[in-house]
Amino acid sequence: MKLLNRLKVFERKYVFLRWATGAEYGKINYVGDDYVEFNIIDVDTMEFRETTIINASLILEVIFGGADISRIVAEISSMLPEA
């Protein structure tokens, strides 16, 4: 299975993404044929800082589970308005 096919499962999910020139927590917005659109989160304020388009061949690591990801999801969820 190719990396891009696997990443399509994680569209709209929070992950830790490491690529050739950086590593950040964020949300995968879209997985294209040869790139990934990634919203970077400022972990201090839990707000989206910027959107990055990353060439898929430069992606080295994607972490989609664990304590850090759970913490980010919990903090983002706590900031949602009450229904």
Language-model-derived ranges and their functions:
Residues 1-83:
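Conserved RNA-binding domains used in RNP assembly and mRNA/RNA metabolism
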